[in-house]
Amino acid sequence: MEENKRVRRKRYSGLYPKKYNEKYKEKNPEKYKETIQKVMKKGNTPAGMHRSIMVDEILHFFDIKLGQVGIDLTTGFGGHSKEILKKLNHTGHLHGIDQDPIELPKTRARLESYGFNKDNFTLHQLNFKDFDAIDTEGFDFILADLGVSSMQIDNPDRGFTFREEGPLDLRMNPNVGIPAYVRLLEMSEIEIEHMLIENADEIYAKEIAKEITKAKIQGRYIRTTLDLHQVIASALQKVSKKVYEEELKKASSRTFQALRIDVNSEYEVLFEMLDKLPGKLNPGGKVAILSFHSGEDRLVKKAFKQYLNDGVFSMTEGPILPSKEEVFNNPRARSAKLRIAIKG
């Protein structure tokens, strides 16, 4: 009888938390610089951090001149704003907008740590539909990145992801409106189905809407992200086992997207912002908008085409897609579409 060989314990690789309170070590960049480098080298985005998309393409198009005044309608982590401020080189002024009261103070501190101050930039806690309230005659360039920031996605307390347990909230500004779980309680089965189709082209819209309604009738309230994920999993039970996991992942992503768009009235807000664009652009002013799903892109495309036909814009171009290299280094860029325009 052969003796059992002693198996050497696998050495800790550093890629997962040794202690629970060290989960997502990347969120502590000062302490875990090597971990962050490993994550980014593999083409992933470190948890709690945001990697700005198509920065080079946007800066090339803007061709920023010293002394210009611009606005970043979706400041977020401040990645685009940082690079714009470097181009302005302590001249002119950059206004930044974000409706998120949790992340905005962090971004202000981040930009100040790079050496910029109130003479260089001003941050406003606003919904970008209200950007015309900023007291300035006009802007030389306007940027909008319509994607959800990684800081929001990677924070389970915000309820933007089905990968971790958290309250089903999904509000960009948690102080405004109602959380997603309340919204679901208010909606009928047909309203949920239409929302999923309209906001995310969800192919399992009927099944998911039916399962959500069934859960409500049975008193199984959908209050957390995992509650909703489990309901979606039940709705897809007839899907082939070979593709079930992948289909569940896609359906959950689309459902969360659709609900986020609904809760934040994103289409209505985008439409209002696009309507105000020409009036706030200086002659020869430039606008660049990054979108991440077909619904957003359709609205931007339609508005730009209309302004071009009306002679308001002298040129439009798009969609411009991120390079293969950028998509490899930052997978969250894969669905990005950039549209640009110049006011005549």
UniProtKB/Swiss-Prot annotation:
GO terms for molecular function: rRNA (cytosine-N4-)-methyltransferase activity. The keyword Repeat does not apply. Its EC number is 2.1.1.199. Keywords: Cytoplasm, Methyltransferase, rRNA processing, S-adenosyl-L-methionine, Transferase. Pfam families: Methyltransf_5. GO terms for cellular component: cytoplasm. Disulfide bonds: none annotated. S-adenosyl-L-methionine binds at residues 78-80, 98, 131, 145, 152. It catalyses: cytidine(1402) in 16S rRNA + S-adenosyl-L-methionine = N(4)-methylcytidine(1402) in 16S rRNA + S-adenosyl-L-homocysteine + H(+). It is an enzyme of class 2 (transferase). The keyword DNA-binding does not apply. It is found in: Cytoplasm. One of its GO terms (biological process) is rRNA base methylation. Its main location: cytoplasm. Belongs to the methyltransferase superfamily. RsmH family. NCBIfam families: 16S rRNA (cytosine(1402)-N(4))-methyltransferase RsmH. Specifically methylates the N4 position of cytidine in position 1402 (C1402) of 16S rRNA. This is Ribosomal RNA small subunit methyltransferase H 2. The gene is rsmH2.
